[in-house]
Amino acid sequence: MLKTIQKHGVTLAVFAALTTGLTAMVNALTKTTIEGQAALQQKQLFDQVLPPEMYDNDIQQSCYLVSAPALGRGEKQLWVARKGDTPVAVVMQATAPDGYSGAIQLLVGADFKGTVLGTRVTEHHETPGLGDKIETRISDWITGFAGQVIHGPNDTRWAVKKDGGQFDQFTGATITPRAVVNAVKRAGLYAQTLEPQLSTLPSCGENP
């Protein structure tokens, strides 16, 4: 009887060990797959705001942290694109705090000379059928920033047409596009100041 119990105990222990090992392996594989998918999605988003032919570094591994009012409250991430060893452009997280239904989160690509290379919305709560035209699945409005140059903070073209600028507003919704235009302009102006600061920026994940 005792031998039978001991035998069953050993069997259960082996089974438990195998199950634990298998679970750990599955979790590790799942984590790797999820991380890989997230990295792929991020790269696809970067390609929409920054032409891939502009740079040859692994931009996702060139991530830095900044606290800049021009990009919105709190700490933001930015990624530096390099050609050879020369910084040529940057992708920045930015926030338009004054959307109609709250903050609008953006990704803005820009060079260091005043040209916005692309913009995409990553999160918003704008009204369906009105403010949601900032999404590419609804409208191509957001693509109109690509190639636009900012000639300083007093460049009045960087406004919606209702305010005397060059960017269309939406029918029945001016607040949303105005907020995005202003946020992209601020981010583009900030990019013009960045190049001399790059060597001093903390890397993402770096301990303070």
UniProtKB/Swiss-Prot annotation:
Known EC number: 7.-.-.-
Residue spans crossing the bilayer: 9-29
GO terms for biological process, alphabetical: electron transport chain
GO CC annotation terms, alphabetical: plasma membrane
Compartments (UniProt record): Cell inner membrane
Entry keyword annotation includes Phosphoprotein: yes
Keywords on record: Cell inner membrane, Cell membrane, Electron transport, Flavoprotein, FMN, Membrane, Phosphoprotein, Translocase, Transmembrane, Transmembrane helix, Transport
Main localization, broad class: membrane
Database matches in InterPro entries: FMN-bd, Ion_transpt_RnfG/RsxG
GO MF terms, alphabetically ordered: electron transfer activity; FMN binding
A Pfam family that the UniProt record links to this protein: FMN_bind
Membrane-protein topology: Single-pass membrane protein
Modified residues annotated as FMN phosphoryl threonine in this record: T174
Leading EC class: translocase
Cofactor: FMN
Family: Belongs to the RnfG family.
Function: Part of a membrane-bound complex that couples electron transfer with translocation of ions across the membrane.
Assembly mode: The complex is composed of six subunits: RnfA, RnfB, RnfC, RnfD, RnfE and RnfG.
Name of the protein this chain belongs to: Ion-translocating oxidoreductase complex subunit G
Native source species: Cronobacter sakazakii (strain ATCC BAA-894) (Enterobacter sakazakii)
